Amino acid sequence: LQKVEPRLAESVREQPELRALLKPDGGFLWRRVAGEQRLSPHAYGVALDLSARRAPYWRWSRLRPHPMQQSYPAAIVAAFEAEGFIWGGKWHEYDLMHFEYRPELICKARILRGLEKMNAAGLGTGGTERGMEKLP
């Protein structure tokens, strides 16, 4: 979070209206995922919620997808993703207030995107050489 804060501060300087979406509403809290038996990422201290009253959650809304999934400020999402967080607004069962520290998922997504670009450009091996196959 220490690395995310300067990115957010710069975004707020450029777009002061973002400040209203940056109020922490949930961080480290021992609890289960709603409707499930497994522990929430909040229980491990790797997730936080921002401005819960302003951010739709799939269990509270009948809209699927929710229009705010497209209109949520990209600067906020980019600031968190640049430092290894994923945003719950990209999920089918969306949680727009939720950011979760999962650098391994960000890394994997970047690798897969790179492989897709290589294959699209005809640079993939097309076989199993070095374990690399053309992606479908």
Predicted features by range, described:
Residues 82, 95-136:
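Low-complexity, Gly/Ser/Thr/Pro-rich intrinsically disordered linker/tail segments
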Residues 1-91:
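Cell-envelope/glycan interface and biosynthesis
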